[in-house]
Amino acid sequence: VTAVKDVPADVLIAEVARYIKESVPQVRPPVWADCVKTGPNKTRPPADPDWWYVRAASVLRKLYLHGPAGVGRLRGAYSYRAKVGRYKTRPERTRKAGGAVIRKILQQLEQAGLVTRDKRGRSLTPEGRSLLDAIAAKIARELARARPELLKYTAPPRGQ
């Protein structure tokens, strides 16, 4: 069985983002999403017009691999190094990502039935886990078709 960690993260996140954009109507960028920054030390909003779906797919992957997690833990997961000081010459510091974007995405994923909330934070529902597993298996099959030496890492097709 192919798991999420068996396929490249960038390919998986792009495919899940495309699926969310096309098939999950509950996950939509709010009106303020086109002018919001993703962290306090960022100077501009993201350049990718579909960044909301990419971040939602990335949150799903992080919950699959490291869940359950809350907004604070995900803020730390999306943190970045920032230059500080008047002339930006002091050593860099870690800055946590903004919480509003992550919180709103988690709320939308809850409405879609892909994430559930409990006392330990948010975790994937069985539907969310099976969605990621199905997309990962599809990606693994496509990669194995492109590079036959990867066949040994995928399960044989049923009926053979």
What are these regions (language model features)?
Residues 25-27, 49, 76, 94, ...:
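Long, charge-rich, low-complexity intrinsically disordered regions
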